[in-house]
From Swiss-Prot:
Native organism: Monodon monoceros
Keywords from the UniProt entry: Electron transport, Heme, Iron, Membrane, Metal-binding, Mitochondrion, Mitochondrion inner membrane, Respiratory chain, Transmembrane, Transmembrane helix, Transport, Ubiquinone
Main location: mitochondrion
Residues that bind heme b b562: 83, 182
Job of this protein: Component of the ubiquinol-cytochrome c reductase complex (complex III or cytochrome b-c1 complex) that is part of the mitochondrial respiratory chain. The b-c1 complex mediates electron transfer from ubiquinol to cytochrome c. Contributes to the generation of a proton gradient across the mitochondrial membrane that is then used for ATP synthesis.
Family that this chain belongs to: Belongs to the cytochrome b family.
UniProt keyword annotation of Transport present: yes
Name this protein carries in UniProt: Cytochrome b
Pfam families: Cytochrom_B_C, Cytochrome_B
Subcellular locations according to the entry: Mitochondrion inner membrane
UniProt xrefs under PROSITE patterns: CYTB_CTER, CYTB_NTER
Amino acid sequence: MTNIRKTHPLMKILNSTFIDLPTPSNISSWWNFGSLLGLCLIMQILTGLFLAMHYTPDTSTAFSSVAHICRDVNYGWIIRYLHANGASMFFICLYTHIGRSLYYGSHTSQETWNIGVLLLLMIMATAFVGYVLPWGQMSFWGATVITNLLSAIPYIGNTLVEWIWGGFSVDKATLTRFFTFHFILPFIITALVAVHLLFLHETGSNNPTGIPSNMDMIPFHPYYTIKDMLGAFLLILILLAMTLLTPDLLGDPDNYTPANPLSTPAHIKPEWYFLFAYAILRSIPNKLGGVLALLLSILILLLIPMLQTSKQRSMMFRPFSQLLFWTLIADFLTLTWIGGQPVEHPYIIVGQLASILYFLLILVLMPMASLIENKLLKW
């Protein structure tokens, strides 16, 4: 008798995705982050669902409803902080996942890569509208500043901003629609994740060497299910430690002050995971130029498959490219730090240099290094 998991229409899909999937035998722990992202998404949807049961998307009660969740709802405080810190863990896994794909040349699977970039944009949008919901000072002013950037678009800018706001300022209509978007987007993301996996399994996983591994595959279960479980336990351990010991480490103290349109916080800044893009935005003195640079800092990822000049897929055996890759990581961290600093000397010039280096590395230096490596290997 054939096994039900190989014959049942639904089980067959799950089987070919998580059980009998042929997987390269040499993939390292850097490949754990895909499953960790899936875990983060599930945790965010579940904690978010319970928060939505008690939250009220209304300007007069939003802030107090979050306080009510933390004070009066059974274990509301842990659900709220798991959700807030879960978002941080989500972005740590996300950036690591993208970094790993860049290093090992996974971007050559173009459909998987492009859907991944679309997923990144949607997760960023979800996180942005979610940050507005507690209706603290930073929520309100973050929403005002970031949505206002659209007014830089010629002709239709101002109309577009008022259309998104649902009025002449960030108010009740804005909060309601942001809550709606924050609720619906994770489900669209889940559907896109399925498409992302579908395209990934068309070509199969890459491996650290970048060499096709068709002759050396092992089943996903039990080898990688157990490996993913270890990663999952570590992720949950770090998340719980953060949530229970330092729940506000990555938050902004200004968000514990109710939103007040009449007083502007001294430093308006987004959550830490947007600071690199915010630093790039601020480094250009022109509004439209800044907005374009902000968009390009993310959309540049779509160009990366076209900028692949190396004859080798992975950076494992390419020392020049490795050096530039780690320079890019250091530059990303520098931008993140600069985004959280006030606009004054020397932070302005450091931010501008880091922004120039970011685009220079991706568009010019890394493709050139790959060509030099090809020449050295007489390819």
